[in-house]
């Protein structure tokens, strides 16, 4: 039955997607290549370049090309992705292209023709070493890019068996699985679910789901033909989608860390491949923008644990180059607006990490001012990253609407949580103990302010806003949401908290919470006293008790002792606890009491 499943995929790839089916004897394990297809691609597309090389290398031309290509792929500074995107160069200055990009426009007929010359192929039952056989290997221009291990649920096996096969029975040190030089992703599939990894590490290999989601949870919706993962060959492994992944999405992330003992800096590289919802969100927005231009706003409701930073980065880079049917660039500038006081390093690294031309990205750091942002918006920078506070000043001036000759895509990061001075106000209140002068109104956030400003000026015809949030307010849904068949506004793309929890990216805190009740009695005279509004009075008294030092100290003792004795050892010592407070002012007071209690008791390892 597994063999029938495999043949179904092969037939679709061949007959519908235009793949070539190659024999497993064509595979060269030490190179992770099908060199015959590689050389055919080069001869069909770059005959003049090959002629130059043949004059130099004579009858060793093919050998020289293959060896140089393999050496470049194996370089730590390059890898397969860089070689596919940038090609290779020889001593005489001759360059060879290994993958032709799909052009954004149809103006350049030769570029379109070159793209059509890319050769996608597939092999079954591939031996990457003696005794170890892979079900399917996918190639582009003779270079292996994906492996697939298939399992059939009707035979009593599932994707979990495929994952264990990768972990226990596949040598991660072979050329096919060498990190960043071998395949870009290894897929584990059954009839219902798909998982992938970008690096085999034996038993510690981590597999991500690549599933659509079912009823807001994990898995995939039921497919009439009984194969719920058919989107893999019907969509993901089509030439256009694979090209999009190779050209615009997959990238190498470099992370710097420092050994706490030796203080030595360490750089680690990892290949970033999207989860299904990330790719879906980017492509959905692109498709709608291509059709409608900067006409619409979009709400991307992605839960915590969704990989939002990468999704924003991919979307920004693709929006910066997207063209309409008339071959016109839709957006002159993409503006990424983050809710931090300063643009955080994680977002900067993700934006800068995706390959782009020099000068294409500008980050408004803490030394920049609103005037610098205004200047950049009037200039030619394609992607600008700024804080929501600088952007708010731009919005108040209606600057985007005034620059009518330019079009803007504004990507708002975490639209629900941005605050306009309320955190600092809470800090000041706590430190000065001015409880009576503050009602703790935490609703004065920038999201509301932005909505108010947009509603004042209306939707600008040259501005499209894409709001990312995990928990949108009703006003946010009304402003950014799309109209559904029932006449209600909803998110343009949704990755729910339920799915994130079921897929294991966030913990369900409701499964692990402890209730601590505070009892107090309101004097009856408040209800009868005309000098007081009952609700207001009760709120003030409740707030006074809630923020009282003694009350907080008692709760903090229980929280920390419970965490220390029951929680912190879990998840290999990385477990965390969440404390939900009634206001930002309360959060600050709890933070100070946590620090005081930990220090007073000499606890280490808790922060």
Predicted regions: what is each one?
Residues 187-188, 384-387, 463-469:
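Structural recognition of the conserved hydrophobic beta-strand(s) that form the central parallel beta-sheet
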Residues 420-509:
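Post-DEXD/H (motif II) to motif III coupling segment of the RecA-like Helicase ATP-binding lobe
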Residues 303, 339, 582:
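P-loop (Walker A) phosphate-binding loop of NTP-binding proteins
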Residues 1-333, 342, 346-357, 379, ...:
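ATP-dependent helicase/translocase motor core
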């Amino acid at each position: 039955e597994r063999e029938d499943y495999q043949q179904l995929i092969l037939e679709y790839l061949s007959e519908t997607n235009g793949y070539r089916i190659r024999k497993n004897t064509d595979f060269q394990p030490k190179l992770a290549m099908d060199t015959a297809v590689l050389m055919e691609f080069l001869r069909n597309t770059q005959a003049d370049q090959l002629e130059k090389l043949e004059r130099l290398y004579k009858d060793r031309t093919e050998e020289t090309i293959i060896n140089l290509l393999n050496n470049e792929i194996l370089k730590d500074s390059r890898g397969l992705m860089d070689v596919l995107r940038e090609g290779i160069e020889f001593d005489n200055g001759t360059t060879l292209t290994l993958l032709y990009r799909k052009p954004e426009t149809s103006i350049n007929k030769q570029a379109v023709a070159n793209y059509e010359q890319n050769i996608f192929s597939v092999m079954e039952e591939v031996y990457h070493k003696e005794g170890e056989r892979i079900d399917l290997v996918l190639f582009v221009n003779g270079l292996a890019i994906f492996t697939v291990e298939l399992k059939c649920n009707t035979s009593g096996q599932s994707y979990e068996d495929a994952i264990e096969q990768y972990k226990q029975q596949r040598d991660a040190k072979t050329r096919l699985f060498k990190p960043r030089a071998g395949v870009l992703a290894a897929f584990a599939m059954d009839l219902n679910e798909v998982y992938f990894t970008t690096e085999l590490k034996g038993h510690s290999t981590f597999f991500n789901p690549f599933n659509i989601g079912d009823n807001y949870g994990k898995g995939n919706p039921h497919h009439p033909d009984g194969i719920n993962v058919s989107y893999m060959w019907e969509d993901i492994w089509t030439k256009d989608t694979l090209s999009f992944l190779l050209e615009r999405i997959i990238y190498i992330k470099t992370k710097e860390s420092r050994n706490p003992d030796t203080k030595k800096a360490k750089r680690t590289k990892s290949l970033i491949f999207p989860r299904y919802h990330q790719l879906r969100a980017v492509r959905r927005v692109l498709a709608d923008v291509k059709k409608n231009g900067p006409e619409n706003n979009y709400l991307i409701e992605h839960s915590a644990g969704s990989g939002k930073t990468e999704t924003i980065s991919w979307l920004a880079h693709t929006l910066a180059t997207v063209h309409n049917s008339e071959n016109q660039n839709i957006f002159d500038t993409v503006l990424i607006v983050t809710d931090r006081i300063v643009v955080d390093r994680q977002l900067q690294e993700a934006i800068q990490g995706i390959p782009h031309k020099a000068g294409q990205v500008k980050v408004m750091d803490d030394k920049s001012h609103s005037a610098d942002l205004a200047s950049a918006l009037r200039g030619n920078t394609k992607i600008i990253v700024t804080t929501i506070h600088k952007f708010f000043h731009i919005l108040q001036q209606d600057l985007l609407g005034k620059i009518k000759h330019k079009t803007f895509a504004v990507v708002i990061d975490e639209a629900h949580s941005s605050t306009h001075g309320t955190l600092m106000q809470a800090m000041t209140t706590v430190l000065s103990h001015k409880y009576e002068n503050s009602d703790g109104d935490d609703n004065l956030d920038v999201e509301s302010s932005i909505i108010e400003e947009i509603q004042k000026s209306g939707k600008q015809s040259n501005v499209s806003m894409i709001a990312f949030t995990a928990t949108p307010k009703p006003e946010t849904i009304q402003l950014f949401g799309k109209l559904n068949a029932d006449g209600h506004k909803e998110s343009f793309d949704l990755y729910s908290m339920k799915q994130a929890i079921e897929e294991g990216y966030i913990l369900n805190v409701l499964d692990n919470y402890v209730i601590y009740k505070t009892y107090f009695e309101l004097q009856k005279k408040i209800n009868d006293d005309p000098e007081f509004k009952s609700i207001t009075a009760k709120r003030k008294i409740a707030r006074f008790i809630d923020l009282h030092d003694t009350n907080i100290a008692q709760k903090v003792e229980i929280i920390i002792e419970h965490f220390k004795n029951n929680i912190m050892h879990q998840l290999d010592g990385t477990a965390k606890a969440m404390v939900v407070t009634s206001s930002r002012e309360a959060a600050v007071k709890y933070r100070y009491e946590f620090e005081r209690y930990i220090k007073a008791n000499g606890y280490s390892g808790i922060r």
